[in-house]
C-alpha cells in the first residue's frame, strides 16, 4: 500500500505523469532511472558557467512532465548529484526532440558518448521559456542553490 491505495504499475505511471518523483521512487523501491548516451549539445551551459550533459531518452520511455528535477547521474560507475531539465529547452532551442540535460555539481570530466544512468528525485519547477538568457541564468542559479541544499540532506551518492 502507498497511502490508502494499492501499489500498481498504473498508480506508479499516474504519479510519474504528475511529476511526483518521491511517490514514484517510494512505490518502486528505487529511484526512477533513465538510461542513454551523452550527446554533444550547443555547449551554451558551459558558456554560461554550468555545463550540462545531454541525453535523448528512448522514444518509448515514459517520462515525467517537462521541468526541472533534482537528479543524480552515474558516469563510469560513479554517481554525481545535479539538477536537470526534462524537455525541449524552449529559451535557447527550437529542437523538438525530448532531451534530459543535467548540470552535475562535482563532475568535470568528459562524458561525451558515454552511457549514463539518470535518477530523478524531486520536481523543482515546470520548464519555461525565459525572456532572455540572462533571466534564465538567474533562475538556474537559484535552482542550483536549492538543489545543493536538498542534497545536503537527501540522496547523497
Regions found by a protein language model. Name each.
Residues 2, 40-157:
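Phosphate/ribose-recognition catalytic cores of enzymes acting on nucleotide-derived substrates
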Residues 1-51, 131-135:
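Classical nucleotidyltransferase
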